[in-house]
């Protein structure tokens, strides 16, 4: 007698034959009453959910975050309340531009999203493996997506579209420079740093606020691929980073990262030379040193990729008391776009999917005002309890003890041009370039020339001009690699 599980329909009815359809005679047409065939095909036709518009190709794992340093002077967040405290977490790493089937070893930014299941609710910290971004206003989000993805006519990735967009934004040079360095192709997800990128805020139990940036430093060491190595890797294994992460965890070689913050007081922010909320710039560590916070380890692979990785939903609106937002325009834009994208992709009740549930609080303790919606399957839809406020039963009482400290804002509502406030586009990419060794600088030139193949002379001149303004040797090196005489480039044009 077989101990194998017996095949049933989705609703539990036994299936008598899984291979042969019901027909009118041995060679006749199929019958519509073959309900199992209909059920199978109808489900198959709907298996694929919308992929993420960005960060479509990803890998993830569960782990544990441990506090290693007391930062309660900055934040009242329970997750950081005492040294040694541990919190369950989930991490998802990804490429950005490629679709769900893209190769892992492409030159691209890597997504770096963390979900902490704290005892005050889920905290999502979304970021990348770079500390900056291409621009600083979210109105350009959709255009970036269009420029780096497939051309509407050819349906092919277009270097011209990509570089035309990047070079039309002088503030993009910092991110582009990072992307053209050796770190543009990490060997794997385990061998790269991560950044919250945005400026966030923290406040303590006295209501005192500071601005912070998050850093996650790999304990496996930084390792990258050169273009020829990446090409071989892609030819041999398109899932190289995913395989490396999965197999390391399966073999109990658990990857670890240390988390740090940079802290800027409100007074320092008011006197900062640049806009401290500008996502195209970093805070220099010499001025704002790294402060250790904790360490996290990924130690459990998902049992099912679709359930835990594909359906993982991150949104920077998922914060906890003691952590808050900032005037960073890009962060403000993401506060809407991330949650909205997840509601489109997974439905309004995606918070009930296991990987997204507030495990640290317990689903039974969730008391949301929201009801109904597709796939409301847990919490009995709050049963027959009161579903409005105010009410006479005291349901949905506020928790005023968790009010945030006030944030002073001023000014007229207007579409302010960032460039009129700050046109210091080139200082930081120039400084980054000079931090590279001569060999690393040469690779930046070579990588740039390779990536710019297929672009117009106008776009190439524009990029050379930006590089030259960051550092003359940077501009000369890129020009030489592209086979362009630097004297033929108008270096004084203001883009």
From Swiss-Prot:
UniProt entry tagged with the keyword Zinc: no
Coiled coil: none
Active site, UniProt feature: 55, 128
UniProt keyword Oxidoreductase, yes or no: yes
Any Gene Ontology biological process: hydrogen peroxide catabolic process
The protein's required cofactors: heme
Reactions mediated catalytically: 2 H2O2 = O2 + 2 H2O
GO molecular function: catalase activity; heme binding; metal ion binding
InterPro entries associated with the record: Catalase, Catalase_3, Catalase_AS, Catalase_clade1/3, Catalase_core, Catalase_haem_BS, Catalase_immune_responsive, Catalase_sf
Leading EC class: oxidoreductase
Record key words, sorted: Heme, Hydrogen peroxide, Iron, Metal-binding, Oxidoreductase, Peroxidase
This enzyme's EC code(s): 1.11.1.6
Residue ranges of the region described as Disordered: 1-25
Binding site for heme: 338
A Pfam family that the UniProt record links to this protein: Catalase
GO cellular component: cytoplasm
CDD domains reported in the protein's UniProt record: catalase_clade_3 (cd08156)
Stated family: Belongs to the catalase family.
The protein's role, per its UniProt record: Decomposes hydrogen peroxide into water and oxygen; serves to protect cells from the toxic effects of hydrogen peroxide.
Assembly notes: Homodimer.
Protein name: Catalase
Species this protein is from: Staphylococcus saprophyticus subsp. saprophyticus (strain ATCC 15305 / DSM 20229 / NCIMB 8711 / NCTC 7292 / S-41)
Lineage, top ranks: Bacteria, Bacillati, Bacillota, Bacilli, Bacillales
Gene name for this UniProt entry: katA
